[in-house]
């Protein structure tokens, strides 16, 4: 059973149709990279998957449960969508860290707010806080920032800030990680440190959907590659098959982007 199914997702902004019937599925532990020219709808697709945008048509399923159905208003209530959104961790192009908080506090903030909803929070506040701090330190260590827990965002490089953002997403223990061009805002020399973290997550069996222009990375780390153009899936295949020359449009695109 797929962990994620995207069924016939369409999205329009006014009269502009951005997504035109996108379907694909993802198994537990798989990594799927979504590639294609700018403007092909890749980011919009990610935002529809985790309901930051409401698809005009189609369904999103996690573990065979419909979490969004454009034809069913019951799945579109804000409270329900906020709960279902916790299936996903989302790492954006921009880091979106709170400048007034340390790296540690940025990672702890969302789970601390969630913990306050627990009926035992007042009684066990110190223990809950201590547990969350241990976990946050562990995730920062995992992304190579164990020595930066007390640093503020302005004291961190762009690559380090993006790694804090990855730790923050992991802290919520999502079933699926979504990455939207996570290196596009970085200086070239900082790109590799973020890609290494994402690759390590792939080796650990984290289920991921990655929108990226880093072609060599995508072909190295992915189980499947989805090539999008003009709001449609042109090809969904293994990296090996993509390289084989069986898909002329994909082959032309890869030549243009100088895949090694």
Each predicted region: which residue ranges?
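Catalytic Walker B motif of ABC-type/P-loop ATPase nucleotide-binding domains
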Residues: 177-180
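Conserved ABC ATPase signature
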Residues: 152-156, 160
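Helix N-cap at the start of a conserved alpha-helix in ABC-type nucleotide-binding domains
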Residues: 188-190
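H-loop/switch region of ABC-family ATPase nucleotide-binding domains
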Residues: 212-213
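A short, proline-enriched helix->beta-strand linker immediately N-terminal to the Walker B motif
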Residues: 171-175
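A short, surface-exposed alpha-helical micro-motif characterized by mixed small hydrophobic
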Residues: 218-220
């Amino acid at each position: 059973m797929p962990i994620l199914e995207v069924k016939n997702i369409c999205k329009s902004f006014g009269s502009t149709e951005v997504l035109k019937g996108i379907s694909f599925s993802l198994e537990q532990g798989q990594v799927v990279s979504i590639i294609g020219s700018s403007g092909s709808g890749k980011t919009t697709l990610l935002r529809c998957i985790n309901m930051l945008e409401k698809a005009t048509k189609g369904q999103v399923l996690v573990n065979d449960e419909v979490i969004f159905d454009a034809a069913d208003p019951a799945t579109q209530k804000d409270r329900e969508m906020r709960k279902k959104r916790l299936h996903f961790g989302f790492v954006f192009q921009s880091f979106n860290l709170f400048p007034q908080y340390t790296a540690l506090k940025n990672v702890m903030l969302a789970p601390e707010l969630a913990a306050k909803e627990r009926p035992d929070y007042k009684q066990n506040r110190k223990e809950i806080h201590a547990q969350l701090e241990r976990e946050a330190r562990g995730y920062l260590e995992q992304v190579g920032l164990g020595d930066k827990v007390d640093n503020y965002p302005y004291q961190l490089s762009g690559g380090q800030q993006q790694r804090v953002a990855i730790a923050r997403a992991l802290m919520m223990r999502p079933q699926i990680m979504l990455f939207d061009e996570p290196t596009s805002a970085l200086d070239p020399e900082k790109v590799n440190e973020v890609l290494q973290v994402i690759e390590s997550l792939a080796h650990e069996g984290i289920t991921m959907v990655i929108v990226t222009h880093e072609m060599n990375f995508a072909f190295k780390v992915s189980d499947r590659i989805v090539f999008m153009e003009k709001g449609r899936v042109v090809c969904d295949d293994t990296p090996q098959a993509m390289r084989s020359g069986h898909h002329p449009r994909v082959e032309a695109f890869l030549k243009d982007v100088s895949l090694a």
